[in-house]
Amino acid sequence: MINQGLFIRVNNFQLLKASLAYKKASNILTFPPIRTSTKHGGGSSKNTGDSAGRRLGIKRSENQFVRAGEILIRQRGTKFHPGDNTGLGKDHTIYSLVSGYVKFFQMDVSLRKRRKYVGVVFDKETTLPRPKDEPTIRRVNKYITSANSAQVS
């Protein structure tokens, strides 16, 4: 007589083998084709964003007439410093405080350091920097006057 346990084991093995073959065949038939890694592995890149330029630089040239509030220089940091009749914005933009003519000049700050300045003067022939002993020129009621000149009321 055949051992019943052996028969069951052999029968179970054959069933298992048949079911695996069926699953293998059914997987091939039912699943769609898979693309290779050349398509799926696109990856990521970190340095693709190229932003537009910020339009920095000198906006008005030497001896050019400007009105009050006009931007003279847009810059990052203080490559140029504000001189006479100019102001410095919070983003280091230099702008005109009065109407006049643009002048660029350099001054020694220390023995080894020289700074570039931009200023606005009322008369085209005026040069900057002005001597330290010379009084500053201011515009009062559209007339150019000296700072130490006496005004009669």
Curated annotation (Swiss-Prot):
Subcellular localization, as worded in the UniProt entry: Mitochondrion
Superkingdom of source: Eukaryota
Chain intervals for the UniProt region annotation (Disordered): 34-57
GO terms assigned for molecular function: structural constituent of ribosome
Main location per the UniProt record: mitochondrion
Transit peptide region: 1-37
GO cellular component: mitochondrial large ribosomal subunit
GO BP term, pick one: mitochondrial translation
Keywords assigned: Mitochondrion, Ribonucleoprotein, Ribosomal protein, Transit peptide
Family (UniProt): Belongs to the bacterial ribosomal protein bL27 family.
Function: Component of the mitochondrial ribosome (mitoribosome), a dedicated translation machinery responsible for the synthesis of mitochondrial genome-encoded proteins, including at least some of the essential transmembrane subunits of the mitochondrial respiratory chain. The mitoribosomes are attached to the mitochondrial inner membrane and translation products are cotranslationally integrated into the membrane.
Assembly behavior: Component of the mitochondrial large ribosomal subunit (mt-LSU). Mature yeast 74S mitochondrial ribosomes consist of a small (37S) and a large (54S) subunit. The 37S small subunit contains a 15S ribosomal RNA (15S mt-rRNA) and at least 32 different proteins. The 54S large subunit contains a 21S rRNA (21S mt-rRNA) and at least 45 different proteins.
The protein, known as: Large ribosomal subunit protein bL27m
